[in-house]
Amino acid sequence: MVGAMCACIPSYFGGSLLVAEGTPDFPDTGRFWRLLQDHKVTYLGVAPTLIRGLMRYGDAEVEGFDLSSLRVTVSGGEAWTEAPWRWFFEHICKNKLPFLNIVGGTEVGGCNFTGTVLHPLRPGSFGMGGLGVGADIVDDAGKPVAAGQVGELVLRNPNIGFTKSLWRDDERYLDSY
């Protein structure tokens, strides 16, 4: 899902997509940051693994590059731990750029949870449920719990990206899935 969005959405809005071959730290440890700087990247999508790998080279490595073209950052692919999240927010987002953490995937119909520019940022968290999913936290009996209480995460509605049927064969879809 993310790959398809990355490939299609920039051109739909008149933008460009930067795809780099190879590893982000070869032939030198500044390669990734130099690509962002030289191409004046405005929208950056990362996975926590990438940031953990790059932050090991130290703060000075990234501080030597001009990343002022960045306007928004997005992450996905895995959960964040606090140290890389804080490092990324401080050194790349400069404690002010929107940093949208997204959970979803092709197999779940798209975006289930996302950060927003309207909600405060907290390490590893999401601002809200994806459009229409009806996210809720419930107890063992399936009843909603009060804010701040521990419970189980449920999605009460199907994701808007879920397949509804097979082409001209609703019955086969219902029988199969």
Predicted regions and their residues:
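Conserved AMP-binding/adenylation subdomain of ANL enzymes
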Residues: 2-42, 57
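Hydrophobic alpha-helical segments, especially N-terminal targeting/anchoring helices
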Residues: 138-139
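Short acidic, glycine/serine/threonine-rich loops at helix termini
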Residues: 4-8, 30, 84-86, 111-115, ...
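Gly/Ser/Thr-rich phosphate-binding loop
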Residues: 12-15, 33, 41-46, 55-123, ...
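Conserved ATP/PPi-binding loop(s) of AMP-dependent carboxylate-activating enzymes
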Residues: 129-132, 143-176
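Nucleotide phosphate-binding site architecture
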Residues: 25, 51-52, 163, 174
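Alpha-helix/helix-capping structural signal
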Residues: 49-52, 78, 160-161
